[in-house]
Amino acid sequence: MSSAVPLNLGIAHSADSPSTRKGSAKRVLLAEPRGYCAGVDRAVETVEKALEKHGAPIYVRKEIVHNRHVVETLEDQGVIFVDETDEVPEGSLLVFSAHGVSPAVHDSAAERNLRTIDATCPLVTKVHQEAKRFARDDYDILLIGHEGHEEVEGTAGEAPDHVTIVDGPDSVDAVTVRDESKVIWLSQTTLSVDETMQTVARLRERFPNLQDPPSDDICYATQNRQVAVKAMAPECDLVIVVGSRNSSNSVRLVEVALGAGAAASYLVDYAREVDLAWLEGVQTVGITSGASVPEVLVRGVIELLAEHGYNDVQPVTTANETLVFALPRELRAARTS
C-alpha cells in the first residue's frame, strides 16, 4: 500500500530544545506524506464523475469526506448533502460517503427506489467484512472507535448483536462479553495508533484470550501521517495541522504532535485561521494535513508563513504512497487518469 523509504528527515538537529534555538533562521518542516489518501481521492472523484455523468443535483449521505473546503466546493457544483436517505427524493441518485454505511441504510435507500453509488473506502469495507465474518462465527466484537462517528456506526451496523463500541482506554472497564474465549477487537481506521494500542492492552488485561484482527485495521495513510509528524515534532516550536474539526485523523495529528514533543500544535481549515500570535518567538514550524485535505489548503499556509519570514521549507519524508483505488464500477469508464 505504501512503500517505506529510509528516513529523509531534512532536519538539521540541535542538541537544544526548539524553544532554546533562538539564533537559528526561521524554517518550515513539511511532513511527507500528508493530505489526500487513496480512499479520499477515490470518494471525491466518485462524486465529481457522478456529476459529469448524471448532472446535478446528486445527493450524498453525510459529508463525502470530513473537510469543509471539499464539501463547500462540491455544494457549489450542485451536490446536496443530507443526513439520512428520507431527505432524498424518490428515484434520485445517492452517493454513500467514504466512511461507509450500515446494511440498514442500504435497505432504506432501496425502499425509496434510490439509485446508489457506494464511495466507501475499500479499507473501511475490509473492516465491515471482518465484522460480518466474526459475527457469523459468534464472536463478541470489541470495536475500538469514537461513538457517533459515521464509520463506527456503519461497521457496528453490520453486526449490531455482536459489536460493542469501545471509545478509548477509559471505556474498557464497562465492557462485558458473553464468552471470554471468543472475543476479537477491530478498530475505526482513523484512530491514533498509540491510543488504540493502549486500549487493546487494557482490553487484553481484562480478556487474556482477546484475538487480534486478521490484518491491521488502522489504515496505512493514518499511520504514515502520524509517523511523519512524530519524526518532525521534537524539532518544532509549533505544528500546524490543516484539517477540519470533525476529521478524526486530523484531530489525532494534533494530539500526536503534542505527544511527540512539539511545543504547541493547532488545527486550522484555512490559512486565514492561523493566529499570528502563535508565531511569536517561533523558529521552526511543522506543517501537515489530514487525509481529507486538498494540497491547495496546505499551500495557503506555506504562503502565509513565507510572508512572515518562514522561507526555508524542508521536507520530512518518512514514506512514499503509491496506492490508487479503482472507482466504483458504475464510474470506471469515466476515469481519465
Curated annotation (Swiss-Prot):
Coiled-coil region list: none
Active-site residue list: 151
Catalysed reactions listed for this entry: isopentenyl diphosphate + 2 oxidized [2Fe-2S]-[ferredoxin] + H2O = (2E)-4-hydroxy-3-methylbut-2-enyl diphosphate + 2 reduced [2Fe-2S]-[ferredoxin] + 2 H(+); dimethylallyl diphosphate + 2 oxidized [2Fe-2S]-[ferredoxin] + H2O = (2E)-4-hydroxy-3-methylbut-2-enyl diphosphate + 2 reduced [2Fe-2S]-[ferredoxin] + 2 H(+)
Residue numbers binding [4Fe-4S] cluster: 37, 121, 219
Pathway terms, separated by semicolons: Isoprenoid biosynthesis; dimethylallyl diphosphate biosynthesis; dimethylallyl diphosphate from (2E)-4-hydroxy-3-methylbutenyl diphosphate: step 1/1; Isoprenoid biosynthesis; isopentenyl diphosphate biosynthesis via DXP pathway; isopentenyl diphosphate from 1-deoxy-D-xylulose 5-phosphate: step 6/6
Main EC class the enzyme belongs to: oxidoreductase
Family (UniProt): Belongs to the IspH family.
Binding site residues for isopentenyl diphosphate: 66, 99, 149, 247-249, 292
Binding site for dimethylallyl diphosphate: 66, 99, 149, 247-249, 292
InterPro entries: LytB/IspH
GO molecular function: 4 iron, 4 sulfur cluster binding; 4-hydroxy-3-methylbut-2-enyl diphosphate reductase activity; metal ion binding
Keywords: 4Fe-4S, Iron, Iron-sulfur, Isoprene biosynthesis, Metal-binding, Oxidoreductase
Binding site for (2E)-4-hydroxy-3-methylbut-2-enyl diphosphate: 66, 99, 149, 189, 247-249, 292
Region (Disordered): 1-24
Function: Catalyzes the conversion of 1-hydroxy-2-methyl-2-(E)-butenyl 4-diphosphate (HMBPP) into a mixture of isopentenyl diphosphate (IPP) and dimethylallyl diphosphate (DMAPP). Acts in the terminal step of the DOXP/MEP pathway for isoprenoid precursor biosynthesis.
Annotated Gene3D superfamilies: 3.40.50.11270, 4-hydroxy-3-methylbut-2-enyl diphosphate reductase, catalytic domain (3.40.1010.20)
Species for this entry: Rhodococcus erythropolis (strain PR4 / NBRC 100887)
Listed EC numbers: 1.17.7.4
Pfam families assigned to the protein according to its UniProt record, in alphabetical order: LYTB
Cofactor: [4Fe-4S] cluster
PANTHER family tied to this protein: 4-HYDROXY-3-METHYLBUT-2-ENYL DIPHOSPHATE REDUCTASE
Manner of cofactor binding, per the entry note: Binds 1 [4Fe-4S] cluster per subunit.
Gene Ontology biological process terms in this record: dimethylallyl diphosphate biosynthetic process; isopentenyl diphosphate biosynthetic process, methylerythritol 4-phosphate pathway; terpenoid biosynthetic process
Protein name: 4-hydroxy-3-methylbut-2-enyl diphosphate reductase
